Amino acid sequence: MRKAGFLAFLLASSLGLAQGVVFLSTQLRPIEEAQKMRQVILKGFSGQVQFVPEDYPVWLNRVLAEAQTGRGTVGVLGGLHGDFPPLVSRGLLEPLDGLYARLQDRGFPQAFVELGRMGTPNQQYLPWMQATYVMVARKEALKYLPPGADLNALTYEDLKNWAKAIQEATGQRRLGFPAGPGGLIHRFLQGYLYPSYTGSQVRRFKSPEAEAMWRDFRELWRYVNPRSTAYEFMQEPLLSGEVWIAWDHTARLKDALVQRPQDFVAFPAPAGPKGRGFMPVVAGLAIPKTAPDKRAAEALVDYLTRPEVQLLTLKEVGFFPVVRVRYGEDLPEGIRLLAEAVSAQSSAKDALPSLLPVGLGDKGGEVNKVYRDAFTRIVLRGEEIRRALDLEAQNLARILRETGAPCWPPDAPSTGACPVE
């Protein structure tokens, strides 16, 4: 089996130069997405491209093998932010500062550009595409917005006052979160609430700022629909009218906006004292130092980040743009509403991206459970905040010690396991 794998690698190496730029990607692996990439998205590129989607271990091992031999065939790498650290730590990526300087007028979100430096002085990757979580409201909720509140620049205080006004006027708790067993409330806590209040996801887990955050969220929960503990996809209660305002992943909100775009608005998540925390799933484009034709590789990165190609990517495979674009009439109205909210969130002046937990192996679910358990203890059961945080911080610290996972953004880098301070 190993021999067959090595022969396949040699064959890929021999074919690489003949096929133009070899584009090795951990993203768009499903057959349908890969076909759309080859037949539609890459069709307008002036050169030849061989799009090779692979699972992460195969992707990583191929790049490491080419670096070891000093003979590369791969021209461009596509991957999630969390795919690149092993390559950055070994110094295997070509700095893209010059390419970014040429393309920066496309309006890449500064928060994503900073992520692409991977904690180094140089641009390790350029943003390629994103998925994320936003908020959606039924239009009848808008008349209850607090005076002076800007829908695209809400604070958590605004959200509380908005939900409170709706309850006082209608007698109903119309704010909703996906806190059911299959819901993504843990991503809200990790990527939205914690960064917005503490500037951290892990280090400041039990900090005084975290205590204040939980007090505020417990107060907000007074205006949240009690059925939220059963919700998994917020598009359903939004469509039924059971909920008027909701937070969720774009894929779990999409049906409501596509079915009845005239009834809804989409907008960024609120900001807290430390900024507008949000959790993007960021994919980037990098060039390995062993790339056989760096000029052709740069041309492909240039092509994939053009506004019109970014829009094509959204239409064909559902990933949102990471450059400034103008959404046209050919885009379904509901998708356009979501896309505009995604763009507004990532390009906000106070945007504070918080990444999915990385380096946890098969213990990612245990970390998610820590956040969900803290929520259950503090918000649903009303336990004393300090005691609950101290207990759950012990669980979080234990998992991080066991995995040795270093800190990830927005937390500052760590040597060894990320500490719970």
Ranges and model annotations:
Residues 315-373, 377, 405-421:
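Long, aromatic- and glycine/proline-rich binding clefts that accommodate carbohydrate-like moieties
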Residues 116-129, 133, 157-202, 243:
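Extracytoplasmic/periplasmic solute-binding protein
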Residues 20-37, 362-363:
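Extracytoplasmic "Venus flytrap"
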Residues 98-108, 151-152, 194-213, 258-259, ...:
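Short, solvent-exposed loop/beta-turn-alpha elements that line the ligand-binding surface or hinge
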Residues 188, 215-293, 419:
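Extracytoplasmic/periplasmic substrate-binding proteins
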